[in-house]
Amino acid sequence: MPTSIQFQRSSTAAEAANATVRNYPHHHQKQVQKVSLTRGMADVPEHVELSHTHVVGPSQCFSVVVQDVEAPVSTVWSILSRFEHPQAYKHFVKSCHVVIGDGREVGSVREVRVVSGLPAAFSLERLEIMDDDRHVISFSVVGGDHRLMNYKSVTTVHESEEDSDGKKRTRVVESYVVDVPAGNDKEETCSFADTIVRCNLQSLAKLAENTSKFS
């Protein structure tokens, strides 16, 4: 079964990273800082650590969620890299249309409409990174009707250790930085964003594992 690890409330795989982040004054910082959100995690390739290094402003919060998937990297990436079709695994997405570009080239922009019940209607999201070789994808929110202003997400996919029966496992790491809305604090903002990210990655894991079984 897929398991997720929420950064602020981590278990075994992220304990070292959690300790590292506690040393950052990210709840009270007064200036811009650079934060590596995977530092201290075991078996993290260098390019993954670099990808999850963010510049964080004094009115922003940040977090990272880790998801292990019992499926090959290629299967996970084939789903995750479809910038034009996030609703394949993001159940909070009602529809998505690419309004600029082809959905593959950096600079492409998609309009994402979300299901009712969320404090948002739609968002405009720009593709910042699409690296098929290193399996890195990143997008930033550049407009829309929502409360997550200046949201930037980076997601990486890399091969993890094999499990007891020799099957390949994949580790998905998603980190983000976002402005804290007026009237909210950093803990509230990260808690909300973490919940969405965690649900998305759990759904991604289930889809990839089911796809892998029949491939």
From Swiss-Prot:
User: Region annotation START-like: residue ranges?
Assistant: 54-209
Q: How does it assemble?
A: Monomer. Homodimer. Binds ABA on one subunit only. Interacts with HAB1, ABI1 and ABI2, and possibly with other PP2Cs. Binds to CARs protein in an ABA-independent manner, both at the plasma membrane and in the nucleus. Interacts directly with CAR1 and CAR4. Interacts with MYC2 in the nucleus. Interaction with MYC2 is increased in the presence of abscisic acid.
> What family does this belong to?
Belongs to the PYR/PYL/RCAR abscisic acid intracellular receptor family.
List where the motif Latch loop lies. 146-148
Descriptive protein name: Abscisic acid receptor PYL6
Q: Which Pfam families did the record assign?
A: Polyketide_cyc2
* Compartment(s) of residence: Cytoplasm; Nucleus; Cell membrane
Q: Where is this site: Involved in interactions with PP2Cs?
A: P119
Q: Know anything about its domains from the record? A: Upon interaction with ABA, the 'latch' and 'gate' loops change in conformation leading to a tight dimerization and the creation a surface that enables the receptor to dock into and inhibit the PP2C active site.
